[in-house]
Curated annotation (Swiss-Prot):
Belongs to the TRAFAC class translation factor GTPase superfamily. Classic translation factor GTPase family. EF-Tu/EF-1A subfamily. It is found in: Cytoplasm. This is Elongation factor Tu 2. Residues 10-201 form the tr-type G domain. GTP hydrolase that promotes the GTP-dependent binding of aminoacyl-tRNA to the A-site of ribosomes during protein biosynthesis. Keywords: Cytoplasm, Elongation factor, GTP-binding, Hydrolase, Magnesium, Metal-binding, Nucleotide-binding, Protein biosynthesis.
Length: 392
C-alpha cells in the first residue's frame, strides 16, 4: 500500500495524557483512537518504543487521530519516570494535556506531580477525564472527586473552575459495554479538547530567532553566521540583534543563503547562512542568537525544573549539593553555572527531579520554557527547562 500523503488542511495540535499510574491513561488513549483514528489496542500503545532526547532515553508511544476540526498527535508514556523526562526534555511537545483521574481513587501523588510539572514546563491548557465512573455508585462521591481535582488544578495556578471535566469509562468505550459512559464520553472529551485547548501559534508567525552554530568570514562580502531558523522569518535588509555571551548588539542582514542559493528570506525550519553588516569575524560566536530586536533578553540567573539522570542512564553515581558547578548546554553551547538547591533540600540524588536556582558565568539569550542539557565534561547528566515566571 502506498504511503498516504499527510494532508495539511486542518490545524495540528500536540497533546498527551497525564495522571497517576493505573488511572487509565493508556486505555483512554486506545479508546480515543477507536473513535477518531486508526484503532491501536492497549498493548500496542503500552509497548512504547525507546527514543533519545537530549542524550536521555525515554519510552513514549505516539498515536495520531483527528476530529472534524483538528489533527492531533498524542503522546502516552508507560512509566512515571518517562513522563518526568518527557515533560522536561520536551521530547514530545505538548500544546495541551488530558489529565486522567480515576473516580474511584481521586487525585493521587502522581496526579499532583504531573500537574506541577505541567505548570513548570508551561503546558498551556488541561482538560480532565474522570475515568472508571462505573466503579462509583454514589453521585455525591463523584461530585466530591471532581471538586477535589478542580481544587488541585487551581492550587497550581490552572483555572480549576473553568476546566472541562468529562466523566466516563475508557474500558466501557473499548468494550462497547455502556454507550453513555463509553463512546459518548469519549466524543464529549474530544469536543472539549477541540474547544478548550488553544491552537498553537505556528513557528513562522512568531518573532524571528536563529541560534548561531558557525561563523565564517567571506572575503569581500563580510561575515556570515549559520544556523537553523527556530522561528519566524528573516528578510534581507531587516535589522536583527545579536544576543547572549557578550553585550547585545544590532546589525542588518544583507543576504540570506540556503544550499548556496541566494534567497530574499529564510523561515522557521530553514538551515541558512545570514550575511551580517559591519560585524567582523571575531565580533560574533557560536552560542549567541540572531533575533528580532527586543524580542529576547540575555540572562545569567534563572529558576529551572531539572531531571537528573540515574547511574544506569549514564548519569552521575553520586548526589550533588548546593554550589554544584556543571555546564549548561543552551541551544549550541556549554556555559558553566552554579546551582543553588531549594531550602530544605540537602542534596539531589541521581534519578530525582528538582527545582533549582542557577547563575551562569556569562549571560545567555533566554526565555521561559527554553530547554537545556546539564553536562559534565561533555557527558549529559541531566536535562532542564527554564521555569515559567522565573526571569526578571
Amino acid at each position: 500500500m502506498a504511503k498516504s500523503k499527510f494532508e495539511r488542511n486542518k490545524p495540528h495540535v500536540n497533546i498527551g495524557t497525564i495522571g497517576h499510574v493505573d488511572h487509565g491513561k493508556t486505555s483512554l488513549t486506545a479508546a480515543i483512537t477507536k473513535y477518531f483514528g486508526e484503532f491501536k489496542a492497549y498493548d500496542q500503545i503500552d509497548a512504547a518504543p525507546e527514543e533519545k532526547a537530549r542524550g536521555i532515553t525515554i519510552s513514549t508511544a505516539h498515536v495520531e487521530y483527528e476530529t472534524p476540526a483538528r489533527h492531533y498527535a498524542h503522546v502516552d508514556c508507560p512509566g512515571h519516570a518517562d513522563y518526568v523526562k518527557n515533560m522536561i526534555t520536551g521530547a514530545a511537545q505538548m500544546d495541551g494535556a488530558i489529565l486522567v483521574c480515576s473516580a474511584a481513587d481521586g487525585p493521587m501523588p502522581q496526579t499532583r506531580e504531573h500537574i506541577l510539572l505541567a505548570r513548570q514546563v508551561g503546558v498551556p491548557a488541561i482538560v480532565v477525564f474522570l475515568n472508571k465512573v462505573d466503579q462509583v455508585d454514589d453521585a455525591e462521591l463523584l461530585e466530591l472527586v471532581e471538586l477535589e481535582v478542580r481544587e488541585l488544578l487551581s492550587s497550581y495556578d490552572f483555572p480549576g473552575d473553568d476546566i472541562p471535566v468529562v466523566k466516563g469509562s475508557a474500558l466501557a468505550a473499548l468494550e462497547d459495554s455502556d454507550k453513555k459512559i463509553g463512546e459518548d464520553a469519549i466524543r464529549e472529551l474530544m469536543a472539549a479538547v477541540d474547544s478548550y485547548i488553544p491552537t498553537p501559534e505556528r513557528p513562522v508567525d512568531q518573532p524571528f530567532l536563529m541560534p548561531i552554530e558557525d561563523v565564517f568570514s567571506i572575503s569581500g562580502r563580510g561575515t556570515v553566521v549559520t544556523g537553523r531558523v527556530e522561528r519566524g522569518i528573516i528578510k534581507v535588509g531587516e535589522e536583527v540583534e545579536i544576543v547572549g555571551i557578550r553585550p547585545t548588539s544590532k546589525t542588518t542582514v544583507t543576504g540570506v543563503e540556503m544550499f548556496r542559493k541566494l534567497l530574499d528570506q529564510g523561515q522557521a525550519g530553514d538551515n541558512i547562512g545570514a550575511l551580517i553588516r559591519g560585524v567582523n569575524r571575531d565580533g560574533v560566536e557560536r552560542g549567541q542568537i540572531l533575533c528580532k530586536p527586543g524580542s529576547v533578553k540575555p540572562h545569567k540567573k534563572f529558576k529551572a525544573e531539572a531531571y537528573i539522570l540515574t547511574k544506569e542512564e549514564g548519569g552521575r553515581h553520586t548526589p550533588f549539593f548546593t554550589n554544584y558547578r556543571p555546564q549548561f548546554y543552551f541551544r549550541t553551547t556549554d556555559v558553566t553555572g552554579i546551582v543553588t538547591l531549594p531550602e530544605g533540600t540537602e542534596m539531589v540524588m541521581p534519578g530525582d527531579n528538582v527545582t533549582v536556582d542557577v547563575e551562569l558565568i556569562v549571560p545567555i539569550a533566554m526565555e521561559e520554557k527554553l530547554r537545556f542539557a546539564i553536562r559534565e565534561g561533555g557527558r549529559t547528566v541531566g536535562a532542564g527547562i527554564v521555569a515559567i515566571e522565573s526571569l526578571e
